[in-house]
């Protein structure tokens, strides 16, 4: 292991220099760390002390800092330095010093057995990491030796102190193994050695746990030690006696938590499923906890009920398949399942009265998966047993999903409400999963219950019960195709009978209707049963999200059946928009809903509705355009522009978004004449320009204007063609006055859709040349303040090369300047900008042969590009961007091979470039590897990743384990 270089520095004023890591200087730095009020001095001291801990001198001062006359803070620092040395710098220790180091650690642990516990733990960690480094060859019976040494009668420390110290050492040993940095082959050897050594540990633990005279602190430590060892995947049958003792210890409240942890860890080991006989012996032990569980629930003892539930779930969830296979024991496993059911349905509202039920949900997934994985005959038998259980589970889950009373819910904190919301989502996911087991019968079951509830005249029903049943329907309908269910028509008929007196119920009614929108599209005759409810809810601000999102779903899925209701929907929507009932985001959704709705109407109807819908906003915008800019009218302008752009996002009379849905879709004939959106845009174009003239320097307003056209272009595609010339002209004026990234993004859309069409090429070429010229000027003035503009510009250039390389043929385009600016952009600190620049070069380099100006500039300035790429790989850019730079190298190699082979050797020639950590041989190997690989891009990426690690001095370190 390489030694770290020590940095010169001091632990504050008057402290020793960095290389003078003496006891005195360390003590002085520690005093500064703990007691100096100056935070800067504290930070300096901490940095210096961290260097001290890894220095060679740490071997000397650590022992001196452990002297009895030192205060605990100093002793703790000395003890903390030792595990760092024994784990990370083991190679520094000469082999002839192993034994003396071991003896010193044993001595110190014995001395601190009755001293500071935190110091004792650090010393135990040091000895544990030393043992792991020596096992199995240099210290074959490490654990047995530890036990023997601490049981020696001639120790000055009392028996209980020695016992606790030994247990601490035995506890940290497996924990250190789990987090150790041992090489993989050594880890396997040490794991095997530890598994053998558990024979020296478990008898001792059993004896201490079952010994009546053992004090509570010792027994608790025993349980923690056992919990640590079982995670080494010790065979379950070897733990049987200790597990039984841990079950007995559950009756002791002081030992309860430690016992639960030990039992759960033992049961949860993956290999435990092989020990079926031991698992079968555990079922009665778990079932024996039911009375303790009931008492805990009755007394409101959440910790005890939580712990027992963890044990039951650990056994059921980890081993359901193995236990289901034991057919002759089906009744005992069913009893365990019913115990877990009790935990799922534990009384009280989650998370205020209980936090246990959520632990059980994954078990029901696992059990169902295991049952459904059996062959047909066996599955049928288990279905017969467990279908009733799963129907009971549905009842339990819907009961748990019920809201508390309004009064009680009002006292809940926002955090508790959020936890309950997440819990209900988990229940929803479980119900959706359970549908696979129960099928259509589940929907019938829910429908029957809801029907009885809503039609019963005997007793008044609670809204919570109704809401939960509807929530069950919604959970299933959102993800499962219910189009063929025979109960949905009845449900649609029941929904209007629900008396909605509460926002939670209103939300669930709305979301349920939304979940059934696809069904409504196939059964349009039922739309009128629920649409009035949705429109009525729009007028209420409380169920805003649910009502607006449901209307949007209906308008999207059922638009071809909505023309008879269109006037009413538009009128209600217009009313709520004018009254400003909803927040901004819901207003935007509502406009999207109206866009879907209008798409299915005749052009004349669309224009008529558009006129009535947006005229008030146009009038408002005209008024705002006359006013002097201020923050208040800016918000209003952005809001109106947002409404228009969201409307145009979905208003598509060509039905582009339906193209993937097959020929059977009922489409209207494609209308002749101008698109209604284009008609409206042309009408308001002058007004938008007027607004822009006053707000050109405001990025938010410019972005909102560009969004209208960008969303319209994306939706209308070729239908947008009549607007192209005037939009190009407007964008040019906008960008010339004040460059904004949003204008470049819109230009990119125009290039993508229209640049290949001869009729539109001239205005687009003129715009492209203009924005390029303006942006190049920006680069001359200093582009670092505008990473967003540079990012968008690079994306525009890449799109132009991809879609219409002819744009680079124009003599007025300064390709050389563009190239140099892109090289500069590679050095930006912002990752998105660098990615966009790399994307530009990967599009540019393949054009070397076909576009003369590109070929010329690559020949002249390509070496500059290569140097920038190598600098980035050498450490100037984030490691996350290496794939992007690898793409450039691959493109250079593929399209400019002869040039690259010359440049790369020249570029890597200077010593220290691109990193001082590289040898000439490593640089030569890299250049040869790159030049050889012209086909496999993935291999080039691997080479670059390997090379950048060498450049950064990270090759072979822990930092790169997941890289």
UniProtKB/Swiss-Prot annotation:
SUPFAM superfamilies, sorted: ARM repeat (SSF48371)
Repeat (HEAT) residue spans along the chain: 24-54, 56-88, 95-135, 142-179, 194-231, 236-268, 276-325, 330-372, 375-438, 440-476, 487-522, 524-558, 562-600, 603-648, 676-716, 720-754, 761-803, 815-845, 860-893, 897-931
Residues covered by the Importin N-terminal domain: 45-111
Top-level taxon of origin: Eukaryota
Transmembrane stretches, start-end: none
GO biological process: protein import into nucleus
Main location: cytoplasm
Gene Ontology MF: a single term: small GTPase binding
Stored PANTHER family: IMPORTIN-13, TRANSPORTIN 3 AND IMPORTIN 13
Subunit annotation: Interacts with UBC9, RAN, RBM8A, eIF-1A and PAX6.
Recorded family membership: Belongs to the importin beta family.
Function: Functions in nuclear protein import as nuclear transport receptor. Serves as receptor for nuclear localization signals (NLS) in cargo substrates. Is thought to mediate docking of the importin/substrate complex to the nuclear pore complex (NPC) through binding to nucleoporin and the complex is subsequently translocated through the pore by an energy requiring, Ran-dependent mechanism. At the nucleoplasmic side of the NPC, Ran binds to the importin, the importin/substrate complex dissociates and importin is re-exported from the nucleus to the cytoplasm where GTP hydrolysis releases Ran.
Protein name from the UniProt record: Importin-13
Gene (name only): IPO13
